[in-house]
């Protein structure tokens, strides 16, 4: 399917009147506007996905996602498998569209550097559960949950010459999660009671498990 058809499909699906067809001139105008919004040339409309680079494909996906002017955009690994320069360009495009639409972006990813650079607030999940939530600068400067601490310690830096230390044990099975702290299983501990949320700073909350609280501290 050509790129122009993929861009128009979503618009047709969300029309109030399914019989209200766009003229060819209107289709061309809409497609060119969407492509321009993500810095792609009009000629891309006549291309097929296999003819595009990874960065171009991601820009088309962004154009489709923003075509209906959403209030919330969910970006799941938007820069996966892209090189660093293309990653930055894609995220800048997404950020520019976000500002223009006055939308919120939920950025899902495992690249902590990317999260730190492009997010205002961050939520860290372990075994499908949130374990720490707060302003991104606060969480990265002073992580309180051991899993967050270990994730940040794993980030390579020019000044860090030490060996990186992995997390022991195996991840908890999502089919058999404990009632208590799932991270405790990684370090040979068991909790059977529900872990409370604690406010540790302004807008900064963690799952406060006493058995693993100090794990990973330097």
Predicted ranges, named:
Residues 1-13:
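Q-loop/switch helix immediately C-terminal to the Walker
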Residues 74-78, 82-162:
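P-loop NTP-binding/switch modules centered on Walker-like glycine-rich loops
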Residues 12-15, 23-43, 152:
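Conserved ABC ATPase "signature" region
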Residues 135-218:
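Short catalytic/signature loops enriched in Gly
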Residues 42, 50-51, 64, 89:
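ABC family nucleotide-binding domain
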Residues 48-52, 56:
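Conserved ABC ATPase signature
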Residues 67-71:
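A short, proline-enriched helix->beta-strand linker immediately N-terminal to the Walker B motif
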